[in-house]
């Protein structure tokens, strides 16, 4: 997961790593949509701090590549049921058709993200939800306005989708 530019700051790219390391009450962390190379980097960085067995007991990953090829379906049964869930949506897993972010961009469609979210939302034990991954500030104004409009449209669609389950 990408490190923040400012040391000791928690970013949407590294909070998962920190909670995996430090939260003894964590039952399962599920990452959906990162590139396989980013997931492998997380395992490499944890070598020495946690062994792979400890990591694999708490971490369940569905890489972009697994989702694209359909291999993800083989792992869905490993998701622990009946636990409280906190959902953190990082829009940088989405394709540029849906959002313009300030980090590396994924290729997931919004309907695919919604299908994944429904696995958790239908359980009904949601503690909270956050959404991060906005456009970069400091880019030329026309591009910034265009990116903001695209992001706002996606934010609105996500809000409407989530509202069916939590409001």
Model-derived features: positions:
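A generic structural signal for short coil/turn motifs at secondary-structure boundaries
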Residues: 3-6, 41, 139-140
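Active-site histidine-anchored catalytic micro-motif
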Residues: 1-37
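Catalytic cores of soluble, metal-dependent hydrolases
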Residues: 37, 53-54, 58-167
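Short, flexible coil/linker elements and helix-boundary hinge sites characteristic
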Residues: 24, 28, 46-48, 53, ...
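Active-site-proximal loop/helix segment associated with metal-binding centers of metalloenzymes
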Residues: 33-55
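Distinct, well-ordered alpha-helical segments
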Residues: 12-15, 41-47, 73
């Amino acid at each position: 997961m990408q490190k923040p530019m400012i040391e000791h700051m928690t970013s949407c790219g590294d909070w998962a790593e920190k909670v995996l390391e430090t939260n003894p009450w964590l039952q399962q962390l599920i990452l959906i949509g990162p590139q396989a190379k980013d997931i492998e980097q997380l395992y490499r960085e944890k070598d020495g701090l946690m062994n792979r067995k400890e990591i694999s007991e708490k971490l369940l990953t569905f890489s972009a590549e697994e989702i694209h090829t359909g291999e993800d379906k083989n792992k869905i049964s490993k998701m622990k049921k009946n636990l409280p869930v906190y959902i953190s949506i990082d829009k940088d897993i989405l394709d540029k058709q849906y959002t313009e972010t300030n980090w590396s961009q994924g290729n997931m469609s919004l309907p695919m993200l919604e299908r994944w979210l429904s696995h958790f939302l239908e359980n009904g034990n949601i503690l909270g939800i956050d959404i991060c991954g906005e456009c970069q500030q400091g880019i030329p104004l026309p591009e910034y306005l265009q990116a903001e409009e695209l992001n706002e449209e996606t934010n609105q669609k996500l809000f409407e989708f989530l509202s069916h389950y939590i409001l």
